[in-house]
Amino acid sequence: MHCLQVVIAIVLYSFGKISAENANCKKCTPMLVDSAFKEHGIVPDVVSTAPTKLVNVSYNNLTVNLGNELTPTQVKNQPTKVSWDAEPGALYTLVMTDPDAPSRKNPVFREWHHWLIINISGQNVSSGTVLSDYIGSGPRKGTGLHRYVFLVYKQPGSITDTQHGGNRRNFKVMDFANKHHLGNPVAGNFFQAKHED
C-alpha cells in the first residue's frame, strides 16, 4: 500500500498538483535534474551543464516540476515562493528565461528573459536588485510549447550591471554568467506553456 501512495504522490507532483514539500523533493537528485534538463534540450539550448539542485518555484498551489505544463493564466503573476539550498551570507542571481522565442522551431529571439534579479542574499529574493521585472509566459498562437527555465547562480561577489534588463530578447544566460564569473548554475527548474485561447 505504501508503494502505491508513493507512486500517486510522484504522479501528482509531476503534474504540479501538490507542492514540493508534500512530494518530498529530496528525491530530486542531481541525476534527475540533469536528465530532465537534457531530455528537454535545456542542455545545450540554455546552459552547457545542468544544475545539481532544484530551485523550488510555486505559483500559489501549483509547483514547477522539471517540465510540467502550466498555463499562461496560472503563471501570470510572479511566483509566490522561490527557494533553493542557499549558503548563508552568499549572493545569488536568479533568472527566468524562454529559449523558444518566438517558437522552438524558429528561436530567432533566443533567449527572451522574463525575470532577472542579482545580488540576492541567501534565498531572500526580495533582497536582490531587480534588473528585469517578472513577466509571465505568453506564447503566441501556433508557436507550440515553450520552455520557461529558472536558474540560480552563486555570485563570487556583488554585481554592478546596468546593461541588462531593458532588452529582453536575444539574452544569453551563459554570456551573462561568463561576464560576471558565475560559473555553472547551482539550482534550476522549468515548466512548459503554450498559447491559451
Swiss-Prot record:
Coiled-coil region: none
Q: Which first-to-last residue range defines the signal peptide?
A: 1-16
Please tell me whether the keyword Signal is annotated for this protein: yes
Expression sites (tissue/organ): Hypodermis, cuticle and uterus.
Residue intervals passing through the bilayer: none
Q: Is Signal included in the keywords of this UniProt record?
A: yes
Q: Which family does it belong to?
A: Belongs to the phosphatidylethanolamine-binding protein family.
Q: What protein name applies here?
A: OV-16 antigen
Q: Which gene encodes it?
A: OV16
